[in-house]
């Protein structure tokens, strides 16, 4: 007998988080990630682009979710024979950084930055760019993601910035860049314009004013146009009123004021909500008749513009009948529609709308009455002013969704600004075509959300009036007539005469000038910097320093990406900018495959908020339940279908309890069984793969089933991972683990322990080892820690030279299915057995008959003989699991079930029209049991010369009541119909008593912490239980076989033996008192 075994004892209750820490140390010791890259360097490349986060804040659950999905896909690709470079990236410029510095230094406007010095300001920004980089690295590593931080890219690096310049010059040279004045979303909080897609990121429900303002007509001060506005602060900039020329308008006499009001007829009820009879209609006319009529301006600030045609009625299609008065106040400096209609009517020049609001949202001196006042605070002052002058007729408010700055969280305004644009509208058709070439998961995000966004693209305002960013490389003359775009550091040196350039930020290059080629003196760089989204969209080029450090041949091997993945919000962010730049430069989609994940919400269903503290720290949850549990919880959720989900720690705990612990127990049981085999044989166990998969030699049907099931699983995982369907892969893997633990091991526990001989034990051990090993490998990209932990132990018994032997599980290849073992029929047959067992238990529970109590028989009812034949290998298992000595078969379902087919007359009428006549209706409504069986089996039936389908009927089955009374219970579920005979004779009752007795003994052994191999004696006292005593004595050998330990009357107790602590127990069996006590032998 061997005294030394291969494996050490495993923990009864594992500490998964602690084991993860051990695995992290192991990976560091063997340099696992770099080893994986080295081992696959000659494999075909699998290109992955990582979207760059800002390091000015800590990673949140959204980052960890996206990172987990990326890690799963990249690990799988690497284990599938691909070389997967995974470079981390950092967004280093833009509003997130500047906003932090402005808060830190108390900066409120541009002049304060200039006074401080751009160089000092940018130095402050640079100092915090990587503030949390080490924490990011630590947390990302802790969450099991293998990604290269040492070879990361940063958008502030000179090489990256130079590639961005090159990208931009390509677009400039193609005529896709222009400067213009447009009304754009503007952040007063950050003092800069935002792009249209940035405005989509932070909408909030707010209360805003809804005012009806009276504008005096020029010809009669007592006649007034009633206009609507929701932005009182724009009224000082009013230059026109806009109507819809097709609407019907009215002139009414107001009963209270005796003044005349003009507004759309359909909006009268809105003005006279409180006094329905408070007016009299004097005139009706079309809106077109109002065009050109003049009115008196509310404020005098732009009175001089009257000579340009201002302060008159214009027509515009954007005026609607569902709100307001049918007359809209027009301030062309603060509304896109206002601007366009004003330019179209020549009341302003395209580059000269009035904008009397400074960069931080305060009125300039032009608006003398409110100079220096913040616009939203001016609302109430303007309302008061108008009310005192009798011009405010309705002062109310309304709720609506309004965009806020994604960085400063202040309400945006729309403001006319001079900006630089990319002609995305010129790329629209190509963008739409390229979008169709990519493969998105889920599809709706591509075909719906993203396609809709592309259908409505506007030109991209990529310039920002900020400081910490990549400077736009355009040098211009004072009149903007001469424009030079720079595409490289060398070109900048050549044109400016600079000898050394070590940094491209504003403070390093803004002093450089270029001599004019047209006699205009010198050209100076424009003031603006790039929108940081332009930089992240340029990352395929920037991270490689293309085309300076990498040629086209090498770059084309890495473009487009094989895979990217981010949250659904990036459909209007990174996914979009990647596409715009890629389409502009190469007319190509920048990625082949994309997984879009949903948004992680707090447990209360609201957005996660640091200030509200409505979510737990990810590291805290990891320390409680494990990183693997968090990973599996998130990727087995609606999140991988791009849907929202509330993150609940209870869900993570459920993964640990319901998946990891049973899986661990299966693994532990395998280790214990191998140890038992080694002790029994005196040999060292070594996994024999060939023995485990040779189904011609596997005589046990459950062995064949679990091996074939595992091969089908391998095949399924490969197919679905090729489609990037994580939402299909994870549930199937979990289902397999459940089958492994709840069925295979439970049905074969005694074989695996050696109760059926060493040969059977070795066979079952090899089978169990095979499926645990293969399923662990399949799970390894998803849950890298627990799988590594299992594998490091299992590899001790994998023979040298085996394809399963590597230093780490993550160096192994994903298994390929053995085609000869792919057999869905075997799985289907086993599933039928499972369904019978599960439903029979349900029927027993319904009648409150304990599973410990044997029943007379179980009849399986199905009209198909093939169904019964498919169960022949599993009859013994059904008998054991249902606790019955007899399984009967019945094919005549009509004896037990009344079937009825109810035709869908409406559907059939629509399909057949007049052909669905009286005779056919009668035939359809009177199908025989045989007809219904034919319909169910074949899916159709011929009636009166017409073929009707199963979908044309509703099939009902009613179980005959005579089989659900007394000792009988009849029921059905799916294709399973069962009849239980719950009667018991004396022999069955006796077996039931024994089973209850042995069950209590086994529970006591487990409760006292005894191990299977402990030498013990079980003492029992049944002097007060004559029925149980008789039952035990009648089948003592079988009882001892179940207990596997000597069973001795308590009266013969050996006083010299040590009693097992807490093993003395008295319990009831069929109202008889029994006592047991256990001693060490």
Curated annotation (Swiss-Prot):
EC identifiers of the protein: 6.1.1.5
Class in the EC hierarchy, top level: ligase
Signal peptide start-end: none
Keywords on record: Aminoacyl-tRNA synthetase, ATP-binding, Ligase, Nucleotide-binding, Protein biosynthesis
Motif 'KMSKS' region: chain residues: 607-611
InterPro entries: aa-tRNA-synth_I_CS, aa-tRNA-synth_Ia, Anticodon_Ile_ABEc, Ile-tRNA-ligase, Ile-tRNA-ligase_type2, M/V/L/I-tRNA-synth_anticd-bd, Rossmann-like_a/b/a_fold, tRNAsynth_Ia_anticodon-bd
GO biological process: isoleucyl-tRNA aminoacylation
Keyword ATP-binding included in the entry's annotation: yes
Motif ('HIGH' region): 53-63
Enzymatic reactions: tRNA(Ile) + L-isoleucine + ATP = L-isoleucyl-tRNA(Ile) + AMP + diphosphate
Family membership noted in the UniProt record: Belongs to the class-I aminoacyl-tRNA synthetase family.
Protein name: Isoleucine--tRNA ligase
Gene: ILSA
């Amino acid at each position: 007998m061997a005294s030394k075994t291969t494996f050490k004892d495993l923990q009864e209750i594992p500490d998964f988080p602690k084991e993860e820490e051990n695995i992290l140390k192991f990976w560091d010791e063997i340099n696992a990630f770099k080893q994986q890259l080295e081992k696959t360097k000659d494999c075909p490349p699998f290109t992955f682009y990582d979207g760059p986060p800002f390091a000015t804040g800590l990673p949140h659950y959204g980052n960890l979710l996206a990172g987990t999905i990326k890690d799963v896909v990249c690990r799988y690709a690497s284990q599938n024979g691909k070389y997967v470079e995974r470079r981390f990236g950092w967004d280093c410029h833009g509003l997130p950084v500047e906003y932090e510095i402005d808060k830190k230094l108390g900066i409120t406007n541009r002049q304060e930055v200039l006074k401080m010095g751009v160089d000092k300001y940018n130095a402050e920004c640079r100092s915090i760019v990587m503030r949390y980089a080490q924490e990011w690295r630590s947390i990302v590593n802790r969450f099991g993601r293998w990604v290269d931080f040492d070879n990361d890219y940063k958008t502030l690096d000179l090489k990256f910035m130079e590639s961005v310049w090159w990208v931009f010059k390509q677009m400039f040279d193609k005529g896709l860049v222009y400067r213009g004045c447009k009304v754009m979303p503007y952040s007063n909080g950050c003092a800069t314009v935002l792009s249209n897609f940035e405005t989509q990121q932070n909408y909030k429900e707010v209360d805003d004013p809804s005012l009806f303002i009276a504008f005096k007509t020029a010809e009669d001060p007592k006649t007034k146009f009633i206009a609507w506005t929701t932005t009182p602060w724009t009224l000082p900039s009013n230059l026109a009123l806009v109507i819809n020329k097709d609407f019907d308008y009215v002139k009414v006499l107001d009963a209270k004021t005796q003044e005349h009001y003009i507004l759309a007829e359909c909006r009268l009820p809105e003005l006279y909500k409180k006094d329905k009879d408070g007016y009299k209609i004097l005139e009706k006319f079309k809106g077109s008749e109002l065009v050109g009529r003049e009115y008196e301006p509310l404020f005098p600030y732009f009175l001089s513009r009257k000579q340009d045609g201002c302060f008159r009625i214009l027509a515009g299609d954007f005026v609607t009948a569902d709100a307001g008065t049918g007359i809209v106040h027009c301030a062309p400096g603060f509304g896109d529609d206002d601007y366009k209609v004003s330019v179209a009517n020549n009341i302003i020049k395209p580059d000269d709308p009035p904008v009397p609001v400074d960069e931080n949202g305060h009125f300039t001196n032009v608006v003398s009455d409110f100079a220096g006042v913040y616009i939203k605070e001016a609302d109430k002052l303007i309302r008061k002013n108008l009310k005192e002058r009798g011009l405010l007729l309705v002062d109310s408010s309304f709720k609506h969704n309004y965009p806020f700055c994604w960085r400063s969280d202040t309400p945006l305004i729309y403001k006319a600004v001079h900006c630089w644009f990319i002609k995305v509208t010129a790329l629209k058709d190509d963008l739409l075509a390229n979008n169709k070439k990519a493969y998105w998961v889920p599809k709706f995000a591509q075909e719906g959300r993203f396609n809709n966004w592309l259908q409505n693209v506007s030109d991209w305002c990529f310039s920002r009036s900020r400081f910490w960013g990549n400077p736009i490389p355009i040098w211009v003359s004072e009149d903007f007539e001469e424009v030079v775009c720079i595409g490289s550091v060398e070109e900048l040196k050549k044109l400016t005469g600079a000898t050394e350039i070590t940094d491209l930020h504003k403070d390093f290059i803004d002093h450089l000038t270029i001599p004019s080629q047209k006699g205009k003196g010198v050209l100076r760089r424009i003031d603006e910097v790039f929108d940081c989204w332009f930089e992240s969209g340029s990352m395929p080029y920037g991270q490689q320093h293309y085309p300076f450090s990498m040629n086209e041949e090498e770059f084309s091997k890495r473009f487009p990406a094989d895979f990217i993945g981010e949250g659904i919000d990036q459909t209007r962010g990174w996914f979009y900018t990647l596409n715009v730049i890629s389409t502009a430069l190469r007319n190509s989609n920048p990625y082949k495959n994309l997984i879009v994940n949903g948004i992680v919400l707090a447990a209360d269903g609201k957005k996660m908020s640091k200030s509200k503290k409505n979510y737990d720290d990810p590291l805290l949850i990891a320390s409680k339940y494990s990183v693997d549990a968090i990973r599996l919880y998130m990727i087995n959720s609606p999140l991988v279908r791009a849907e929202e989900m509330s993150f609940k720690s209870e869900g993570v705990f459920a993964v640990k309890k319901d998946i990891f612990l049973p899986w661990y127990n299966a693994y532990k049981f395998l280790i214990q069984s191998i140890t038992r085999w080694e002790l029994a044989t005196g040999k060292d166990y070594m996994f024999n793969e060939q023995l485990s998969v040779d189904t011609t030699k596997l005589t046990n049907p459950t062995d064949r089933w679990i091996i074939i099931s595992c091969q089908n699983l391998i095949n399924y995982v490969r197919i679905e991972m090729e489609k990037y369907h994580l939402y299909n892969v994870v549930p199937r893997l979990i289902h397999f683990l459940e089958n492994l633990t709840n069925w295979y091991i439970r049905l074969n526990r005694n074989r695996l322990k050696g109760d059926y001989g060493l040969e059977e034990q070795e066979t079952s051990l090899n089978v169990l080892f095979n499926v645990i090993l293969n399923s662990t490998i399949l799970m390894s990209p998803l849950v890298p820690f627990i799988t590594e932990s299992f594998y490091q132990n299992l590899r001790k018994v994998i023979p040298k030279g085996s394809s399963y032997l590597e230093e780490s599980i993550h160096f192994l290849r994903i298994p390929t299915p053995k085609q000869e073992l792919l057999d869905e029929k075997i799985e289907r047959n086993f599933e039928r057995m499972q369904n019978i067992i599960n439903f029979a238990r349900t029927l027993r529970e319904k009648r409150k008959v304990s599973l410990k109590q044997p029943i007379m028989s179980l009849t399986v009812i199905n009209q198909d003989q093939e169904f019964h034949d498919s169960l022949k290998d599993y009859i013994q298992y059904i008998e054991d699991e249902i606790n019955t000595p007899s399984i009967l078969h019945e094919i005549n379902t009509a004896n037990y079930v009344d079937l009825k087919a109810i035709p869908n007359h409406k559907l059939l009428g629509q399909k057949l029209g007049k052909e669905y006549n009286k005779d056919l209706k009668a035939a359809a409504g009177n199908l025989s049991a045989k007809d219904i069986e034919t319909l169910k089996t074949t899916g159709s039936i011929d009636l009166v010369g017409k073929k009707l389908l199963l979908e044309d009927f509703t099939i009902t089955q009613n179980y005959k009541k005579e089989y659900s009374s007394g000792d009988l219970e009849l029921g059905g579920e799916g294709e399973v119909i069962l009849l239980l005979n719950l009667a018991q004779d004396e022999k069955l009752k006796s077996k039931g008593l024994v089973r209850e007795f042995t069950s209590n003994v086994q529970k006591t052994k487990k409760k006292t912490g005894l191990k299977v191999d402990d030498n013990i004696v079980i003492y029992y006292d049944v002097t007060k239980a004559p029925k149980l005593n008789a039952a035990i004595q009648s089948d003592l050998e079988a009882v001892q076989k179940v207990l596997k330990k000597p069973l001795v009357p308590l009266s013969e107790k050996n006083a010299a033996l040590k009693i097992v602590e807490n093993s003395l127990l008295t319990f009831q069996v069929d109202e008889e008192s029994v006592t047991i006590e256990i001693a060490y032998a």
